[in-house]
């Protein structure tokens, strides 16, 4: 029985496979990033308790337990410092892993290029190879060093955030979740369709063609200047620039509505809370308790925007880097 052919991994799965070259450092970075994400919510819990204590004692502030409030204040500061320390440690580990991975990938890629037939270099073009070596592989370093800890944080943060939203007051939590759901639907429509993937592939192809043409143009610049020619004389360079322009402008404009809608919603989730808050206030018998919870949600929902924006940027960068990795793998798959 022959061995089964293993399907090559693509996308995030392939990026994680590459990151596994320095597995211990990557795992350590992921754990520290997850802990940092949890620690980032400690100040919100402490502030909620401070607000609750103050409103419960109103108007007799002399009854406040000042020692307890001071401890909560220190807990807020400790949460901030712990988040910074853990995230800094996570970045140190991820950068060490990234530099080691980058070195290995570049050495392997250069060694492979030295062994492939000469005709392959003529067919592909040095501009495309230079882009893969200098840009695509460099972006993998950026993914491991920065995006990977952010991916872990963007997975852990929504879980902690959801728990807080539902535990403090499930009614206000559901109102906030409606806003989050609308934002996620917009994000999925923007990233999670075949059109977005196809457009990203076309963008990468146009960029590589322009790189190839630019390298050839620079190499032939002495001849061009000697005979008083312009860029129009090098038809391939001119066509590559026009093709890139024709592709990148619609690509940019395609994000006009999605990005505007997503940014507007994630930065104004509190608007979903206000109507629900008015309805609850009209029927509640514990105004102090409700006021403390409502104020907490108004303070807390801006953190939702931070989490969702981080998820959006991680997704966007992941698509670009994945496309670059696929091109690197295509070169590495060439027979020597």
Please describe what each predicted stretch is.
Residues 54-62, 164-178, 261-325:
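Helix-loop-helix
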Residues 21, 25-36, 149-202, 276-293, ...:
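Transmembrane helices of ABC transporter permease
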Residues 1-40, 61, 67-72, 90, ...:
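Membrane-integrated ABC transporters
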Residues 26-86, 166-171, 285-291:
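Transmembrane helix-loop-helix hairpins at lipid-water interfaces of multipass membrane proteins
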């Amino acid at each position: 029985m022959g061995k089964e052919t293993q399907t090559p991994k693509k996308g995030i799965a392939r990026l994680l496979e590459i990151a596994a070259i320095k597995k211990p450092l990557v795992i350590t970075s992921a754990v520290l990033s997850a802990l940092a994400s949890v620690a980032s919510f400690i100040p919100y819990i402490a502030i909620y308790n401070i607000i609750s204590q103050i409103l419960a004692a109103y108007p007799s502030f002399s009854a406040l337990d000042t020692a307890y409030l001071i401890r909560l204040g220190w807990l807020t500061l400790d949460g901030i410092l712990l988040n910074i320390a853990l995230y800094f440690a996570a970045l140190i580990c991820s950068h060490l892993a990234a530099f080691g991975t980058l070195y290995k990938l570049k050495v392997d890629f250069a060694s492979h290029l030295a062994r492939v037939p000469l005709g392959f270099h003529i067919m592909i073009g040095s501009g495309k190879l230079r882009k893969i070596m200098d840009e695509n592989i460099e972006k993998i370093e950026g993914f491991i060093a920065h995006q990977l800890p952010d991916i872990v944080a963007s997975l852990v943060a929504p879980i902690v955030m959801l728990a807080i939203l539902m535990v403090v007051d499930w009614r206000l939590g559901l109102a906030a979740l409606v806003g989050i759901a609308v934002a996620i639907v917009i994000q999925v429509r923007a990233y999670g369709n075949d059109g977005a993937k196809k457009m990203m592939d076309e963008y990468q192809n146009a960029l590589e063609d322009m790189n190839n043409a630019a390298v050839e143009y620079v190499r032939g610049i002495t001849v061009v200047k000697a005979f008083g020619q312009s860029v129009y004389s090098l038809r391939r360079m001119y066509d590559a620039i026009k093709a890139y322009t024709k592709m990148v402008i619609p690509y940019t404009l395609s994000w006009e509505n999605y990005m505007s809608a997503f940014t507007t919603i994630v930065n104004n989730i509190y608007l979903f809370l206000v109507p629900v808050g008015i309805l609850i206030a009209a029927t509640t018998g514990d105004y102090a308790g409700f006021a403390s919870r409502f104020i907490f949600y108004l303070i807390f929902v801006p953190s939702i925007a931070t989490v969702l924006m981080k998820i959006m940027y991680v997704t966007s960068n992941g698509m670009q880097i994945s496309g670059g990795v696929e091109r690197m793998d295509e070169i590495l798959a060439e027979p020597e």
